[in-house]
Amino acid sequence: MTLVKSILLALAAGHVAQAQLNTAAKAAGLLYFGTAVDNPDLSDSKYLVNLETADFGQITPANAMKWQPTEPSQGSYTFTQGDQIASLAKSNNDYLRCHNLVWYNQLPSYITSGSWTNATLIAALKEHINGVVTHYKGQCYAWDVVNEALNEDGTYRQNVFYQHIGEAYIPIAFAAAAAADPNAKLYYNDYNIEYAGAKATGAQGIVKLIQAAGGRIDGVGLQSHFIVGQTPSLATQKANMAAFTALGVDVAITELDIRMTLPDTSALQTQQSTDYQTTTTACVQTKGCVGITLWDYTDKYSWVPGTFSGQGDACPWDSNYNKKPAYYGILAGLQSGSGSSSSTSSTTLITTTTPTASSSTTSATTTSATSGAAHWGQCGGIGWSGPTICVSPYTCQVLNPYYSQCL
C-alpha cells in the first residue's frame, strides 16, 4: 500500500468517525434519523446524553401515547408519560413522531370487554383520538394513527374495532386524527410489509381504502424488525417502498432493529452492519422515504431479548453505549447517495415547537424450541435457527423465503 493511499484511508476513517447519523441523514435529503424511547430509560443519564448528540433528530414514544396509558378509564385522560417525552423532544429540538392511536394491543379492559354497538364504539374511538391528538396538537410531526391492523395473509385482524365497526374503523380513525390536528402527518404502521407479499398488498389496500373514503393518509410506516442475514435485499426494499409511494404517500422506516441469535460473534456483527447499511441505503435511494427510526438505540433497553428467546444484540449501540459495526453500516448507508428522499405528500411538515414498534409493537413472539413457537411467532425462514413447530392448534406457514409464522 502506498503512503498516499494509507493517508487517504486514514483521513476517510477519521471522517466516518466524526460524522453523526442525523447530520448524515439530513445531508442525504432525509428529514431525520431518530429513535424510540421509553419512560423508564429516561432515568439513565448516559442514555439521555447520547440522545442530545447529532446522531438523533427525532424521538418516538415507544409506549407513553398508546390507549392504555393515555385513557385508562373512559373519558379520563393522563398525559404525564407522553408529556415527558414530548418535553424531551422539544428541549433537544427534535421531531416528535407520535405513536399510536389505534392498536389491537395495550387497550384498557373497558374497550376489550365492553358491550359495544357499532355506534357506541365509533363514538369512543373518535373521542379517544380527539382527546389525545388535541392535547398534542402542534407538537407531533406525525402520528401512527392505526397500528398493525393486518394478519399475515393481508386480511384484517379480528380486533374489537373490526368486529364492531368493520374495515370502516380505519378511515374513521384517520378522519378523526386529521380533524384534531390538520398539520400532523398521518401514518398507517405495520411489520412484515417491507417486501412484496400479501401483507404489503393489504397495507396498500388500506391506503386506497382511506383515499377512496375521501380521507387523508400521508404515509406508511415500515417497522423493519429484521433478522441478521435475513434482511430483504436492497432491490426488494426499494421496489416495495416505491409501490407505496406510487400511491401518493410517503414511507418511513419506523421501528428498525436487526436481531441475531446469541451468542454474538464478529461474523454476526459484520453481517448485521451490512444489513443495517442495506436498509438505510434503501430509504436514502427512494424518493418519498422521509426518515429512519430505531426501536431504541442501545441493546441495554432493547425489547428483543424479552420477546424472542435466545436472540438479542439488535441495536447499533451495545449495552455499554459503545458503537457497534452496525453504527458504521448505518452511516455508510446514509452516505450512499440517492435520487431524492423528499416527501411525496403535500401537507406541511412541522417540527416540535412545544411540549411513539410496545417495548414490543410487533405481535410475533417465540417460545422455546421444545414447546414450539407461540401464535404469530416465527417458525422458519432463511437462516432461522429457532423453533420450527408451533404450539397447538397453530401450524407453521411459509409467508416468504425469509419468514414463516405460526398461524
Swiss-Prot record:
Residues 371-407 form the CBM1 domain. Residues 20-333 form the GH10 domain. Residues 337-364 are annotated as: Disordered. It comes from the Eukaryota. It catalyses: Endohydrolysis of (1->4)-beta-D-xylosidic linkages in xylans. Its EC number is 3.2.1.8. Optimum pH is 4.2-5.2 for birchwood xylan and 4.0 for CM cellulose. It is found in: Secreted. The active site is at 148 (proton donor), 255 (nucleophile). One of its GO terms (biological process) is xylan catabolic process. Belongs to the glycosyl hydrolase 10 (cellulase F) family. Pathway: Glycan degradation; xylan degradation. Pfam families: CBM_1, Glyco_hydro_10. SUPFAM superfamilies: (Trans)glycosidases, Cellulose-binding domain. This is Endo-1,4-beta-xylanase D. Keywords: Carbohydrate metabolism, Disulfide bond, Glycoprotein, Glycosidase, Hydrolase, Polysaccharide degradation, Secreted, Signal, Xylan degradation. Glycans are attached at residue 118. Residues 1-19 form the signal peptide. One of its GO terms (molecular function) is cellulose binding. Disulfide bonds join 283-289. It comes from Talaromyces funiculosus (Fruitlet core rot fungus). One of its GO terms (cellular component) is extracellular region. The gene is xynD. It is an enzyme of class 3 (hydrolase). Endo-1,4-beta-xylanase involved in the hydrolysis of xylan, a major structural heterogeneous polysaccharide found in plant biomass representing the second most abundant polysaccharide in the biosphere, after cellulose. Shows an endo-mode of action on xylan forming mainly xylobiose and short-chain xylooligosaccharides (XOS).
